[in-house]
Amino acid sequence: MIKNYWKKFWKNSTTKSQNFIELNDIAYGNLKRVKVGIEAYRENVIVYRCINLIAQSAGHVPWKVLKSRTGEVISELPVHYLLKRPNPEKAGVDFFSELIASKLLFGNSYILSTLDSYPKEIYLLPALATELVIEHDNLVAYRYKSSKGDRIYKIDHIAKMSRVLHLKNYHPLDQHYGLSCLEAASLPIDLHQQSFYWNHSLLQNGARPSGALIVKDSNGYLSDEQFERLQAQLSEKFSGNSNAGKPLLLEEGLGWQEMSINPKDMDFIESKNSAAREIALAFGVPPQLLGINGDNTYSNMQEARLALWEETLIPLLDKIADSVSNWFSYLFKEDIIIDFDRDSISALTEKRENLWAKISNANFMTLNEKRAFVGLPPIINGDRL
């Protein structure tokens, strides 16, 4: 019966076909086009992990308000409660985690104050729904687009007041908007996704590479009718994950020749890991913390976590603290210094203890100088050596 089926393709014909069956498209389908943007956060596990690791780690660090002159911590000011409970919808941890995630994803974050001065609540404006209003190359307002209509928040340049604080990454080609980390990592993200789709399609095909049917008889040609019928039969019976591993019975005169490069030779796993390392580099995350095989830049995980805090998270929190301090100083009409509590960061514990031991043993500093160095208030008779 199989012989009779294949003999249907070998009828005499005066028309020779020179068409090609694109077996790659049959076996694998069209590769999905990678969209570098917010889709990368949803679809790429490395991007998702990097952003969540940075946002959640930095977002959990407590904030504190200091006196501008003495550096003493103040816990009774309205600013302190505002940082701890920004609004009824979000606690401080969620608020700052989302702020940092938006800054990484879009290059921009926007904080809205409920009042022009002495605000009771602060909110985050979605980066995709917020625009800068530029007139004569000067920023004059912020426009927030919502389902209820646009809202304009003007900037008072005379009083140096703005209800919106714009936090942005440095962008060499745009003075108004920040540069997203996803743009810098666009090529590694694309490579990582393509490697994933290749492996996924290979698994759907039963880990069998594509190939070609070679006609050994009839001068190596098929008629148009034979070509179309053979193409339809191959597509229906022998391609796709449901037909993976199904044996292909060939009549005399037909042969199967593998055409794809051996996946082992192409080493897609290593290229995927290399792309993952470059993505982590763009976000400032040590690849070792992501569990990438073969990456042991640091001797242990503690050193990798310390590098993450010192090289990425602390500079990020310093920048946020400076921006929020400056903004609140104008809103509350007093000099306010906002800082984050470095003593609460567990990754810095060992380094902090070594520093305290050196300060304690320093015989050229007074007791109050030592206390001021670690953020403690002075005591009576503490200025003597």
UniProtKB/Swiss-Prot annotation:
Alphabetical list of NCBIfam families matching this protein: portal_HK97
Species this chain originates from: Rickettsia felis (strain ATCC VR-1525 / URRWXCal2) (Rickettsia azadi)
Domain of life: Bacteria
This protein's name: Uncharacterized protein RF_0471
Family in the record: Belongs to the phage portal family. HK97 subfamily.
InterPro entries, alphabetized: Phage/GTA_portal, Portal_HK97
